[in-house]
Regions:
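A short beta-loop-alpha structural element at the N-terminal edge
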Residues: 4-19, 28-30, 141-155, 163
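Conserved donor-binding loop and adjoining core beta-sheet/short helix segment
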Residues: 22-91, 200, 208-228
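Conserved GNAT-fold acetyl-CoA-binding loop/helix
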Residues: 25-42, 163-183
Length: 293
């Protein structure tokens, strides 16, 4: 756009960018109350980026960060009074990332912002969601324990196999049984985790993992816990085992006074996408993804 000036993001832009982000988050809270509140918006602005100025007024900003594998725009990484300007900012910033994989997190309730990224060839990869806990218990569900580790290995291998199949086509690599055992070995001694299993006829056929996630980003409300994992064996899918795990997790959180449960899932995982939406989880953010070229 000829009347727009694009500049590197600097400290002089912090105040105006934080104001844009605050406006975006206020709109988001109007549609979904279970998000972060009392936010220091300046502190949320992380990474290197660019701004779009019109007549000297900041109208949009974009901040990115890189890992060894990809580049990403986090929950506070973009906001705009004129969303179309984000396309110009991406064109200016993305070459600096020198990464083929790009991901961006945008509010699910902001269609103008989502549309901009769709028109930059990004697609929806993950849904991040939230809901309130409610009283309840799941039939056949109990707390997990260390002697469930053999079944945990079986469930984790089954989950990886499921994600690698169509239509997910995940690049997730199958770990060895020993690697899974090592990953899970300390779970039952770590107070951040709550492991649940569901039994049928005396056999564990599924499990769930609750995780006390640290607050700090716009997605995480106060006093929440994350439902990090729900997996059942293929032969019991559709029999209510997964529903029992979720009901028990919601009830466990309710009994302990949590105000919210967060979750995320891969939308191309058809079982997960339909299952969690049907259980009252409301989308808060979309993780959009693009592979270049």
């Amino acid at each position: 756009m000829p009347d727009v000036e694009i500049r590197p993001f600097s400290d002089e832009h912090l105040g105006a960018a934080a104001a844009l982000l605050a406006e975006r988050h206020e709109r988001h809270l109007a549609t979904e109350p279970l998000l972060a509140r009392d936010v220091d918006f300046r502190a949320q602005l992380r990474g290197e980026g660019v701004v779009a100025l019109r007549d000297g007024v900041l109208r949009a900003y974009l901040l990115g960060q890189t890992t060894d594998d990809d580049a990403f725009v986090d929950f506070a990484g973009c906001a705009a009074a004129e969303p179309e300007l984000l396309r110009d900012l991406y064109a200016a910033l993305a070459p600096q990332w020198a990464r083929e994989r790009h991901r961006v997190y945008v509010p699910a309730s902001d269609p103008a912002l989502v549309d901009v990224w769709f028109r930059l060839a990004f697609g929806l990869q993950f849904t991040l969601a939230v809901r309130e806990p409610v009283a309840g218990r799941g039939d056949g569900v109990r707390l997990g324990r260390r002697d469930d580790l053999d079944t945990v290995v079986e469930l984790e291998q089954s989950f990886t196999d499921h994600l690698r199949e169509a239509p997910s086509f995940s690049g997730r690599q199958r770990e060895t049984d020993e690697e899974i055992r090592a990953d899970w070995q300390d779970t039952w001694d770590d107070e951040r985790f709550i492991h649940l299993v569901v039994e049928r006829d005396g056999r564990v056929v599924g499990h769930a993992l609750l995780y006390r996630r640290e607050p700090g980003d716009l997605r995480i409300p106060a006093n929440c816990i994350d439902l990090a994992l729900v997996v059942t064996l293929p032969e019991v899918r559709g029999t209510g085992a997964g529903s029992a795990l979720v009901a028990h997790a919601l009830g466990w959180a309710h009994e302990r006074g949590f105000d919210a449960i967060t979750i995320d899932w891969r939308v191309v995982n058809l079982l997960a996408d339909r299952f969690f939406r049907a259980r009252g989880f409301r989308p808060t953010f979309m993780r959009l993804y693009r592979h270049v070229p």
